[in-house]
Amino acid sequence: VEPLKMDDLTKYTFLSGPALSPDGETCAFAAHQMDLAENEYRSDIWCYRLSDRKLTQMTTSHKDGRFIWLSDGRRLLFSSLREKEDIKAKESGEVFTQFYTISLDGGEAQKAFRVPFPVSSITEINPDLFLLEIVWWPPFETLAGAAAAEKPKLLQSMKEETDYEVLDEIPFWSNGEGFTNKKRTRLYLYDVKTKDLSPITGETFLAETPQLDETHERFAFTGIDFSDKLEIRNDVYLYTLKDKSLEKFSMGETFLTDYVDFWDKDTLFVVGQEQRNYGINENPKFYAFCLKDKTLRCLTPELDLAPGNALNSDCRYGGGSKPIQKDGEAFYFLATEGVGASFKKICPDGTVETVAQMKGSLDSFSIKKGKLAFIGFHELKLAELYTFSNQKFEAVTDFNGWVLRERTLSNLERLVVKADEKHPTLATDIDGWLIRPVPFDPDKTYPGILMIHGGPKTTYGENFIHEMQWLANEGYAVFFCNPRGSEGRGNAFADVRGKYGTIDFDDLMAFTDEVLERYSFLDPARIGVTGGSYGGFMTNWIIGHTDRFRAAVSQRSIANWVSKFCTTDIGYFFVPDQNSATPWSDVDKLWEHSPLKYADRVKTPTLFIHSEQDYRCWLPEGIQMFTALKYHGVDSRLCLFRGENHELSRSGKPKHRLRRLKEIKEWFDRYLK
């Protein structure tokens, strides 16, 4: 058994997208690994057969991570770049998605069809007709309709146009996507035989979550038409294939529908929120929308939990499965509850039941004919594929078992900080954990690092996080908690609108006090603090309000709510929602809650880590804070990652992820050891 090493990150296998075949007998999923030499990720499709436990690698091109089952139940349809001509065409700037099929019976993948747009999702209506969600942009349309002889000239013209960006709407860029002005997700029908591509939605319409009914004669989806400013609301639409009719249904003036499906032929299943009581982060409710009388009925008025998994980890890669899935009469979903993710179902009468819970994290799932498959992190194990029957989980893969067998890991010690006389600033108990250094000697004292999650509406749980375990193996105690603002404990607990840097700061400081009191091996003169996104905001805030931390690492942070409002992809709606103010309604309030205001008080040596293409918390946020600290004579450093975005720590290029970890450790070593 050896210590966990920084570059063990490059040896893990990340699993995603489990999907059971139509008969529920075979589960396909994607497996991803880092390729350090090429500085990229390799993705392949695997299948696990439930009846005889046979595990088969279906593809080996390392470029195949997204797929669907075809209705015959014997073949998978997936997008890939395999042939030299296709790779060359992509490199020249051509825009298309090439689909292949591969059979469970073996043999090579077969070319299926090509679509002249980037395809973000595909659904089979029948063997000759597919519903596509495509990324549409006017130049893509021009290219798609051009004759082969015209394409070189058009591609050259498009290449020249990359020197300019013309913007006339907000948002005009999006983290991970770059400039998005006039780009839309549109729905199309694709006829395999005629190669006809027919648009369902218009050029300025943003469509999402298309879902077929059981007869495959209709599909529902959500969307909004916009040309100047994207509003954070949408409507529900119903398309009937036979007569090509499109109906629009409004769920309410401020209603945001997250997901739509069919309870039955006359009733839509709607998941969404009115955003009236808790703003854009309000937990959604489940509804039934009657197509006959156009009425919306809330099935879960008392429910206060969010579908989806909000647990933090740096060991995920690849897309998830559909977040909500129907099987029989019920819909199934994951929900973040307390410090874990549980698997639940909702019945037509609105009854919500817990089906399964795992200590660790349930990441994604598939359910077909009562059969269940999950990607999960059980306790300190990394992701594996699990089946679930007779109230028991069973790991059916062992991609990452070597980590537990061959590396030293440290258990998570849970501590609950009580809201009592000792902690007068706490309004409620706070969940937290500490990971001891490895190896641990009770007669020694150790440096510690407080880690703060992003969101703020995400959460820490009891699952594997490489960065934490590695720092523990480097001699640090790592401690972390879920302050007010976090997910998993309902709307009221998560509501920090207009209070950033107040109650959340109090919770983090009370937690730090408790950790130092409870663990005498921690040296209070050698503790550091770090966090990313909202955690970066809190790091910036903390160093302006206390000198108790010897060093700080602020990552993809927020420094100034005014600049955040006017420059980032979500700023124009996120900032007023979270701060109850705009630069024009109350600029003083925004400045009051901006860490930059307090930069003249900072004495803590701070490393800033930022990505050049982070449009969620744009580069000027890190630069402003770094410049302010340098101006005031504080030891500081800015490490900028080219070609990376807000997801650097989770899906950045392998070499960049290692460099980020190296920068963090070396900064803390310098001041805490």
Where are these regions (language model features)?
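Cap/lid segment of the alpha/beta-hydrolase catalytic domain
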Residues: 399, 403-525, 532, 566
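Short, solvent-exposed loop/turn segments at conserved positions within beta-propeller repeat blades
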Residues: 37-42, 85-96, 178-184, 228-234, ...
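Multi-bladed beta-propeller domains
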Residues: 1-14, 47-65, 90-95, 100-119, ...
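Conserved beta-propeller blade repeats
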Residues: 12-27, 61-77, 85, 116-131, ...
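Predominantly five- to eight-bladed beta-propeller fold
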Residues: 43, 86-96, 135-188, 284-289, ...
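Active-site-proximal cap/loop segments of hydrolase catalytic domains
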Residues: 483-673
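Beta-strand-rich domains and repeat architectures in extracellular enzymes and scaffolds
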Residues: 7-43
